Regions:
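Catalytic domains of carbohydrate-active enzymes, especially glycoside hydrolases
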Residues: 1-19, 263-264
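Gly/Pro-rich turn-and-neighbor structural signature
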Residues: 172-173, 186-191, 196
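Short glycine/serine/threonine/alanine-rich loop segments
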Residues: 8-9, 184, 342
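Short beta-strand segments at enzyme active-site cores
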Residues: 10-15, 186-188, 267-271
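Alpha-amylase-like alpha-glycosidases and glucanotransferases acting on alpha-linked glucans and related
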Residues: 23-169, 193-487, 495-497
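Conserved hydrophobic/aromatic pocket- or pore-lining residues that grip, position, or stack substrates
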Residues: 124, 179, 189
Length: 497
């Protein structure tokens, strides 16, 4: 309602797929490509058949979200435990009390309609609880058929998990319909990969290459992390066996998109570059510390000659780039065909090959425009009025700090140099030692970034040579929203800066 009243056209969310039992799970490490996370279920009694309001007076505890917030704001394990306790009680009422007997057939019919993914998921959850981990390669039984036979002895627990998924879909579909009625599109997020510790990989292992872990090559934006600066980002996701997926016309991907668009009106594809080629590591993230100090030769010795590289082929030769372009075009067309007419956005940040963005525009998939990353060869910033219409303008994604933080960090570097008399009237002084050289270099970097921002939104020096304030905030976001991009967005925390 707030979004609609503020005339916001869409609300983008991070992935909402099931997260498993980890205390600090990432929404990009879901244990299923389809199943939804029950942590987000509403506990309004009218939204959960079987839930009785009196149960809230019987817990004896203050709900976790009503407790004083600590530095992490939400105690997710506590919220999960509290919600599951209440939902189990509701499930008991739902299946035993006669007033819910008329709804039970609808639930059973829904279960029948889901196909294999739901049974795989509920079995996987039972096995995770039984063996104490989602790391299935540590289980005493790793054969899918035999593991499923073990899970068959826990039908009641499986049924509870099925019911939770039914509730999740019903609630999300209600929200999606309501949002559509208020002219607000809910934007989902499809991660480029699935967790190695997922029901998909365990039960459909033939679709995944688990010998390699997907990630991204080393590049300057994450230089503060020594492993990322040296080797790149190792996300630990298995690679797709696209040739195997092609044998059933990419049914796994079609199913994934179909279920996403049941609850979202549009969606973002995370790290869309990997549809063309993906940077892969021959070791899991748990081994990053082992490989960090090694040379490439030493690393190759440990892996039998394998080193991080683009897969299925490199990206340097013309023939490689042509084939990568053809692959990406094919795979993205099949994704789009799974939900015709649904708007799609592609997160195309990082080391972007020059053939990717033209192809995305050809497919009508807007890519990202991060203003302070859009710099001309002469060093000036590209203005919003120069953006291609098929683009998505934003000052950052969930991986970024807020714009206020970026601005204040940059200005603080200038102020530090100024207080040390190393920066006078916008001009740096000549350093006399390495420490001063470092301080001046940081101030120059900060001034360059703020000047880009100022040029982007037309601010004068007397306005932008300052810490973040309402005038700067207004100018920055006004310029963003006036860009030629099809979409423009701000991070939710930025509303409160």
């Amino acid at each position: 309602d707030w979004t609609a009243d503020a005339h916001v056209g869409f609300l983008q969310l991070l992935p909402v797929n099931a997260l498993g039992r980890d205390e600090c799970p990432s929404p990009y490490s879901a244990i299923s490509s389809i199943a939804l996370e029950p942590l987000y279920l509403s506990l309004e009694p009218w939204t959960v058949p079987g839930l009785e309001e009196r149960v809230f007076n019987e817990t004896g505890d203050t709900p976790p979200w009503e407790q004083p917030s600590g530095p992490d704001l939400v105690d997710y394990p506590k919220v999960r435990s509290w919600k599951m306790w209440i939902l189990r009680g509701a499930w008991h009422n739902f299946r035993t009390k006669p007033e819910y007997a008329g709804i039970m057939p609808k639930f059973r019919e829904w279960v029948k309609e889901q196909g294999s993914w739901l049974e795989d998921f509920v079995c996987f959850q039972v096995l995770c609880d039984l063996f104490g981990t989602a790391i299935w390669w540590h289980w005493p039984e790793q054969d899918p058929a035999r593991a499923k036979a073990i899970a068959a002895d826990y039908e009641e627990e499986k049924d509870f998990s099925r019911w939770l998924q039914w509730l999740c879909e019903k609630q999300w579909e209600f929200i999606r319909i309501y949002a559509d009625e208020r002219n607000v599109k809910l934007m989902g997020d499809i991660p480029i990969g699935v967790s190695l510790s997922s029901s998909d990989v365990f039960f459909e292992r033939h679709l995944f290459n688990t010998d390699w872990c997907g990630g991204a090559p080393a590049e300057g934006n994450y230089a503060a992390d020594p492993f990322t600066a040296k080797w790149g980002q190792n996300w630990g996701i298995p690679l797709y066996k696209w040739d195997v997926m092609a044998q059933d016309n990419f049914a796994w991907w079609r199913r994934r998109v179909k279920y996403c668009t049941k609850i979202f009106s549009m969606y973002r594809i995370d790290h869309i570059l990997d549809f063309y080629r993906i940077y892969a590591f021959p070791w899991k993230p748990t081994e990053n510390d082992v490989f960090l100090p090694l040379t490439r030769e030493q690393a190759a010795e440990r892996t039998g000659g394998r080193l991080p590289a683009f897969k299925p082929r490199g990206d340097d030769q013309v023939w490689e780039r042509n084939m990568n372009l053809a692959d990406g075009d094919l795979y993205l067309r099949l994704v789009l065909s799974a939900a015709p007419g649904v708007s799609v956005v592609g997160e195309d940040l990082g080391c972007v090959p020059d053939y990717v963005r033209p192809n995305m525009r050809q497919l009508d998939i807007p890519g990202f425009k991060i203003p302070h990353w859009e710099i001309k060869p002469d060093g000036s910033i590209i203005l919003g009025k120069e953006y291609h219409e098929c683009s998505f303008a934003a000052f950052g994604t969930h991986d970024f700090e807020t714009l206020m933080q970026t601005w204040n960090d940059s200005y603080a570097k200038i102020e530090r140099a100024r207080k040390l008399n190393l920066w006078m009237g916008g001009v740096p002084k000549t350093p006399s030692n390495p420490e001063q050289e470092h301080i001046i270099k940081e101030a120059e970097d900060g001034a360059r970034l703020l000047k880009w921002f100022a040029d982007y939104c037309g601010m004068q020096p007397e306005t932008w040579m300052s810490y973040w304030n309402l005038e700067i905030k207004t100018a920055m976001y006004r310029a963003l929203f006036r860009s030629k991009s099809r979409y423009s967005a701000i991070l939710w925390p930025a509303l409160f800066d």
